[in-house]
């Protein structure tokens, strides 16, 4: 075997895996640089974790997965890792943690961890073929180089932000090896309307309580030329399905009597 582990995708999950899995590791990505979504996250400062990270905050068909995953590696473990690498950070609203300077600090930290572990990183590289063999997997890089690995980790992420190179690679490859892929729906997205009913107040933000299917979020809401956005809308979009009503309360903490 050429490698013990092949990791496909050099995002946050892929780099953490390559840094900690041990043995001979090859990590590949079709992008020109690793961690591209990290680089743009949090407005360029990377909202790398949350003080209040809890299994109940995750949406999953299998709630126990979030419990077991977070029990094995908590937000405090990652905060400790960031502190050990002397990356300054600060807390914003609702326990959100951001780098003081740049998301590039997190990328550099993860690259350093991979290098220390001896993982080999190949960029601008596509896995053009992947097959299971008796002893592991054989794969082809950029249609020419053929190698083998005992294990394969698919860490290419979802289809979000296609302009940055995101594809449905994982959804196409995983079923080849017997995995069931759950159909996906857009999440953490704004609500848009066919008309431009809020165009005159586009750019106006206000606190609001947004409710869908019994789940509410009290955060900022933003009127846009196409509809509604902002933290509250993005959060509740994960709980909404087509045809469901949405309740927007613009004065959730105000007694009606005091206004009248």
Locate the predicted segments by residue.
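Residues at the starts of beta-strands that form the adenosine-phosphate
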Residues: 4, 24, 120, 180, ...
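N-terminal Rossmann-like FAD-binding beta1-loop-alpha1 element of flavoenzymes
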Residues: 3-27
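An anion/pyrophosphate-binding glycine-rich loop and adjacent beta-alpha core
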Residues: 32-34, 39-40, 48-55, 88, ...
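Feature captures the FAD/FMN-dependent oxidoreductase FAD-binding
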Residues: 72-151
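General beta-strand structural signal in soluble alpha/beta enzymes
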Residues: 27-29, 91, 121-123, 154, ...
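Glycine-rich loop(s) and the adjacent beta-strand/alpha-helix scaffold that form part
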Residues: 151-197
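Glycine-rich active-site loop/strand segments that organize a redox cofactor
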Residues: 43-93
């Amino acid at each position: 075997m050429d490698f013990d582990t092949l990791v496909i995708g050099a995002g946050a999950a892929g780099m953490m895996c390559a840094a900690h899995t041990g043995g001979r590791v090859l990590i590949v990505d079709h992008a020109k640089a690793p961690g591209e979504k990290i680089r743009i996250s949090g407005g360029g400062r990377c909202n790398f974790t949350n003080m209040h990270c809890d299994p109940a905050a995750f949406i999953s068909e299998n709630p126990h997965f979030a419990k077991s995953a977070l029990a094995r590696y908590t937000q405090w473990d990652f905060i400790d890792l960031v502190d050990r690498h002397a990356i300054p950070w600060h807390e914003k609203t609702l326990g959100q943690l951001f780098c003081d300077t740049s998301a590039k600090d997190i990328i550099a930290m993860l690259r350093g961890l991979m290098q220390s572990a001896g993982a080999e990183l190949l960029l601008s590289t596509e896995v053009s073929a992947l097959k299971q063999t008796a002893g592991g997997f054989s794969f082809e890089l950029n249609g020419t180089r053929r190698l083998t690995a005992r294990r394969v980790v698919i860490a290419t992420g979802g289809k979000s932000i296609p302009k940055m190179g995101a594809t449905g690679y994982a959804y196409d490859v995983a079923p080849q090896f017997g995995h069931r892929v759950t159909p996906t729906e857009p999440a953490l997205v704004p609500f848009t309307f066919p008309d431009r009913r809020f165009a005159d107040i586009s750019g106006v933000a206000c606190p609001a309580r947004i409710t869908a299917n019994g789940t509410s979020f009290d955060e900022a809401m933003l009127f846009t030329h196409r509809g509604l956005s902002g933290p509250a809308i993005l959060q509740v979009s994960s709980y909404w399905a087509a045809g469901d009503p949405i309740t927007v309360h613009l004065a959730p903490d105000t007694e009606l009597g005091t206004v009248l």
